[in-house]
Design a protein with these regions (language model features):
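Helix-start (N-cap) segments at beta->loop->alpha junctions
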Residues: 145-148, 153-173
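Juxtamembrane segments flanking the first transmembrane helix
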Residues: 1-81, 86-89
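Hydrophobic beta-strand residues in large extracellular and virion-surface proteins
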Residues: 25, 29, 72-74, 125-128, ...
Length: 176
């Protein structure tokens, strides 16, 4: 059997993982906001973030290990990135290579459009096609915090051989 034959099931499997990731991030943001933590602030065009909170969040994401190649984009009401974790060789959302990922100041039309879409719809799932022929499609899940203070976008590649194997094993149980 080919992975292509199981593409809808495979995509649903990845979507479930991304949705869980996005919802757990928004839950952490909501909890911090409810506890009165200041997560980010703009002052005279300069961004300050709560590095303690976001470093802890990043550690939790890597420790969970549910996604091995992903991007997390957290933006505020200004539609600008306040925190980003880039862990893909190429990110269709930010249009960056992994080596370029430290630059949070870039305004990328794709990322801004997806943030706006999430704020407008309250949450969505979409496939991001690669900007060039040699790239791969990526699945994106967007969620907002309950009060609308932050938008969380999570993406991952749709080319995961290991994940395809897991899906195959659920469809075709093998007894060893």
């Amino acid at each position: 059997l080919s992975t292509q034959l199981l593409e809808p099931l495979y995509t649903k499997h990845i979507e479930k993982q991304l949705t869980t990731q996005a919802e757990s991030i928004t839950a952490e943001l909501d909890k911090a906001i409810a506890n009165g933590e200041a997560l980010s602030a703009w002052s005279f065009g300069h961004l300050t973030v709560n590095t303690t909170f976001f470093d802890r969040l990043a550690t939790q994401l890597y420790a969970s290990g549910s996604l091995n190649s992903f991007c997390v984009d957290i933006s505020d009401t200004t539609m600008r990135t306040i925190y980003k974790i880039e862990n893909q060789s190429y990110c269709n959302l930010h249009e960056t290579l992994l080596s370029d990922s430290a630059n949070n100041d870039m305004i990328v039309s794709t990322a801004v459009a997806m943030r706006k879409k999430c704020r407008t719809t309250g949450g969505f799932v979409q496939t991001l096609n690669p900007p060039r022929l040699s790239g791969s499609a990526q699945l994106l899940v967007g969620r907002n915090t309950s009060g609308g203070e932050y938008t969380v976008l999570v993406t991952t590649s749709l080319v995961h051989v290991a994940e395809a194997g897991k899906v195959l094993s659920t469809v075709l149980p093998l007894s060893l």
